[in-house]
């Protein structure tokens, strides 16, 4: 049995114990005793509520304190200075954005190199096929040999450049280990906060039930709807001539102002 059930059980036990005593005190006219019994019931209810709020506060504080990063992770020293969950998520966005921009820059630098090599290879392939069909004269063949030699050199250089870019792209993804850990911790924290708030709501609803407190759910829903749409206009009135709460002319306006003392 958790503490909330214990607190509610204590309140229920006290309520059952004092209910009959309260009735007897009222019937016998001992109003002082009745007031004292009511006071004890209120104290029991408040004590249980305060205990639960304190417990939930301690659990929430413990969850926040334990919100740490593995010190062996890269860049852990920098992120360990960040204590707010929102700032941690912003830090994740910063790392992710930086890695994405770096990756796109490297891809943009590699694309022209690959396109140029592809075009050169296509042109050489066409001329090589002509050579294989013995359609190339000696001077043109010597030029073809020079082009092939240049292509091989250029191809090796382009390959080294693209290979380096691919390696840099791979290194740019190292942020995922750190950001994954940060997001996992934030998710755990949010889950714990949600769970604790749910416990508080459930406990408060039980206290309301024992205290006989009833809420106007229709009014609460209407207020929540107004909060969601604070700028929603009422718009033009439909069938205004059939409604008594709508002014339809200057005479009605004058009567309204007169009734308000203007």
From Swiss-Prot:
What Gene Ontology molecular function terms does this protein carry? phosphoprotein phosphatase activity
Q: Where is the composition biased (Basic and acidic residues)?
A: 218-232
What Pfam families does its record include? CheZ
Q: Which Gene3D superfamilies match?
A: Helix hairpin bin
What residues does the record give for site: Enhances dephosphorylation of CheY-P? 181
Q: Which UniProt keywords apply?
A: Chemotaxis, Cytoplasm, Flagellar rotation, Hydrolase, Protein phosphatase
| Enzyme's top EC category | hydrolase
According to the record, the residues making up region (Disordered) are 218-250
Q: Which GO terms describe its cellular component?
A: bacterial-type flagellum; cytoplasm
What are the subcellular locations of this protein?
Cytoplasm
What protein family is recorded? Belongs to the CheZ family.
The protein, known as: Protein phosphatase CheZ
Q: Which gene encodes it?
A: cheZ
